[in-house]
Amino acid sequence: MKLISTIRFVFVCIVASGFVGQLVAQTPSLEALGRQGPYQVAWYTQLPSVPEFSGATLYFPANKAQDFGGVVISPGFFERQENISWWGNYLASHGFAVITFDTNELNDLPPLRADALLATIDMLRGENSRQGSAVRGKILEDSMAVMGHSMGGAAALLLANENSSEIKAAIPFNAGGLRNANFSAVAVPTLVIAGEIDRLAPVNEHAWSHYQTLTNAAPRMYMEVEGGNHFIANTAEVENERLRPNIDVHELVGGMAVAWLKLFLDGEEEYRELLFGEMPSEITEQLSRFEYQK
């Protein structure tokens, strides 16, 4: 495979008080998980080119001593990587390798995006052995999760529905494009994130409807942000104002997503109580609908 040209490789230093090992030894609160994590983040774009998508960026925790699981994320309809880029930096700061990508066409539908997600998983696994890879020998190839926004979220569900054996968790946010679809074959823990006033993918026909079909996905969780629009879990600092979150809930959705990945990718059981124990009122008061099966 031909290598695409490198745009840049930088380290983004995250200022954290104390020694990193000390910070990660304790189970933080959901509120703390919602903030930037303890690891320094590096990212690069020198990745093998594949036919399923165009450009891609790999974020990873540069100073994490242990090996790490991987997360691949698809943007939504007529979106680019920049619309989900905050997830890459944020999740890497909490200890995960993350790939975001651009679809071949901005209007690619969910099945093509699902193919792209699967190809991205293969790429991330390949980085574990590729000469010149900055994460060579560091990726836990059997610990993969999929995420995505809008049609990318529907794609994450499609992949989980058809290829659950390839992943350990799925986190669709504001999934759209597959109205009233059935995802009963999903067999991995799935966190569904939605916005109460999503006008582009109304929850009763999309996210909430999808969640109700996840009869084989246990555990599963549905969190619907009160007053949230279609873009609540997307990057806030984008040029097109119409693609921005209408309220700032990054700490809320981020904290829940990190806890989900810590439990189901990393196998850290101490996070189970955070997710399925008594939820703090400062969390539940931000949700218009919250349900789970553990």
Each model region followed by its residue ranges:
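Bacterial N-terminal signal peptides
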Residues: V10-G18
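N-terminal cap/lid segment of alpha/beta-hydrolase-fold proteins
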Residues: Q26-Q66
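Gly/Ser-rich "nucleophile elbow"/oxyanion-hole loop immediately N-terminal to the catalytic nucleophile
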Residues: Q66, P111-A154, E162
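Short amphipathic alpha-helix adjacent to the substrate-entry channel of hydrolases
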Residues: E82-D102
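A conserved short beta-strand
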Residues: S165-A175
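Active-site-adjacent alpha-helix of alpha/beta-hydrolase-fold enzymes
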Residues: V186-V188, I193-G255, A259, L263
